[in-house]
């Protein structure tokens, strides 16, 4: 019998196996006859039995020790190579997040107050950390996340070295603040992504009612511990986002207030007066986003034209003179179109309005310009009616009658009385045609009566019936208004005659179900509004003098009319009015008396 040790076998196990082979060796060597002749004493039998039992116990103990040693070797590398991303879920859930100060960034973050009630009901209360986002708190986070003692010991020193290098490279506190804003913004994005991924996972793993009915025990197990942990983690993450949003609103609206206000004032070229300094002091005392919002509102409401000059890109002597008249309250107006025409303020609109009135007054002293504007209006409405597949014959007759009535000097006094009764404060082309007729018509079409909308939105009615009903409604309203006229045959009466042909077409175009006609009417309105916006823009026309402004308005009118008439398929009217005649579709030109 030789002592053998196989590969992969320990010394103790090999010895035990050798001892266990002794009885077999003796039996095979001396034979069964020798054992039959052998007489064992009771003491020897006890020794042999104890030896065999001890050998078996020793083999089992060696096997058990070997299994435990292998298990330790497998667990050791896993714990040593564990990273931050593999931290168990309970540790992540129990970990407290330090508060970080953050300002507003370029991306607008939605506040949790705008979310649903179900989302808000899942927010759990977490005690906020009393530590700031300094290097020490960051180092503590590194120690918690790291299982290596080397990393834990070197964390504070590495963080301190990074902080010193950043401070040396850029000692500006404002730039450091902006870097913190960017880092906190990245953290917000990661937290939002984690929350959205968790919500998608919960919705994707929601068991169906059929599964629960087929196997209730399996369904209850699926909704047990892992799902409750995920739900608790999502609630705490949502609470973290909720507090982060509040920090963002609080510190973003107060910390850089002075520098932001100074940049704003430099951009608008506004001087620092006592009023703005007082508002800045009030802003510095406020800590909530609501206070900051109202203080900003007060600031912009206080930026009046009378106190602060509007930045002018070019000299505008006529505009400055009109602005002085506005300060004295000498520029009346029926309706303020400040926002529609893109003006800085009501005073800015009134000053430009005064200049535009003077420019149109100078333009319409020329007979050819009168004919030009009259012909452009006629061709625009004719093109609209042609696009709507309506005959413009009745409109042309009523339009010529209104135009000839308006150009007679003996009718001007009566026309003034009629228009003053409608709120028109100045007898200018802008106030009568552009504002009273066109802009009021667009406003009426934006807010139609509910009865008209009910007919147009009825799916059971045909388009032809809707068009007929809408035209009947327009005629009924105009007929009722005509009965209340102060002058039965005056300017307003002629205007109503024109409206009887135009109003149904415009109303059905803007409100009706035909997309092609709606597109044409929308383009028509856009060109008119853009024409007025360009007219009230200091960069597009010259407000240096009234003649220069009149010349620019005329060129602007020609350009816009060419665009609109070209879209409607009508010949351009740029050359009309230069020879004092109106071209006719059939027959020779006819001079306008």
UniProtKB/Swiss-Prot annotation:
Pfam families: Miga
Transmembrane segments: 11-31, 42-62, 563-583
Post-translational modification: Phosphorylation at Ser-295 of the FFAT motif activates interaction with MOSPD2.
Motif (FFAT): 292-298
Localization per record: Mitochondrion outer membrane
Membrane topology: Multi-pass membrane protein
Location (main, coarse): mitochondrion
Region (Disordered) location: 101-134, 195-228
GO cellular component assignments: mitochondrial outer membrane; plasma membrane
GO BP annotations, alphabetical order: bone development; mitochondrial fusion
Annotated Low complexity bias: 124-134
Biased composition (Polar residues): 107-123
Entry remark concerning the domains of this protein: The FFAT motif is involved in the interaction with MOSPD2 and its phosphorylation regulates this interaction.
Similarity comment: family membership: Belongs to the mitoguardin family.
Protein's job: Regulator of mitochondrial fusion: acts by forming homo- and heterodimers at the mitochondrial outer membrane and facilitating the formation of PLD6/MitoPLD dimers. May act by regulating phospholipid metabolism via PLD6/MitoPLD.
Protein name per the record: Mitoguardin 2
Source species taxonomy: Eukaryota, Metazoa, Chordata, Craniata, Vertebrata
